[in-house]
Amino acid sequence: MKKLRIIDLDTMDYHAAGEVMREVRDEVEQGANDTLILVEHNPVITIGSDGSEFSIVDSSYIKKQGIPVIHTDRGGGAVVHNNGQLVGYPVMRLSDMPLDLLKGIVDTLADVVAVFDVKSEKGAEPGIWVSGSKIGFVGMKIHNRVSTHGFALNISNDLDLFRAIETCGVKNERVTNLTLQTRQLISMDNLKQIFISKFSRRFNYIPDQFIMKEGTDAV
């Protein structure tokens, strides 16, 4: 089994976390262990390569709330990131991959919500849904056979901001979070440990090195 490095960024703004992700990508390209970065972001809207300015359906609300809109190089459309949502960046060499990367991540998200007795469904696009409402999102980029970007899983986050976008290019896409589905107060730290366990099992890793980096509340 391969070793998996874990980097927990706590809460970090999107740009700063992206810098860490790209630094880790360079390290993995040079031979470092595959790495899973976990983070929460302050409110931000990101638009992937499949999205455009038309992904924003209520720009006045976004401006009023002071929410940054950032175009990224990942796949997919527009997605909201905010506190109470677990974001993960698996930085992995595809040449060593035992299974399809996107499918493995989607299946891991399903494994995680199943721990809380929540049954999820898959759709035509990467992600998971619960009773027709999207709860897990996946958007990746591959550079020199190394993956970047990754997934987001709604845990206890405010869902109002999703109404201002076409989530993943789908008009009027309903969304939900794990707290709404379980009526439980879910610890983010506990959720991270569950995800690490399920991810490691899916991809045949041994979590080996845990690195905690100090986050920032900057937008």
Predicted regions, residues:
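A short secondary-structure junction signal
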Residues: 50, 100, 140, 163-165
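Active-site donor-binding loop signature of nucleotide-sugar glycosyltransferases
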Residues: 11, 140, 180
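N-terminal lobe of the biotin/lipoate ligase/transferase fold
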Residues: 1-129, 134-135, 185-186, 214-219
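A structural signal for short, well-ordered beta-strand segments
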Residues: 88-90, 126, 138-140, 151-155, ...
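Short, conserved beta-strand/beta-arch hydrophobic-aromatic motifs that form part
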Residues: 53-57, 135-156
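C-terminal accessory segment of soluble enzyme catalytic cores
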Residues: 160-219
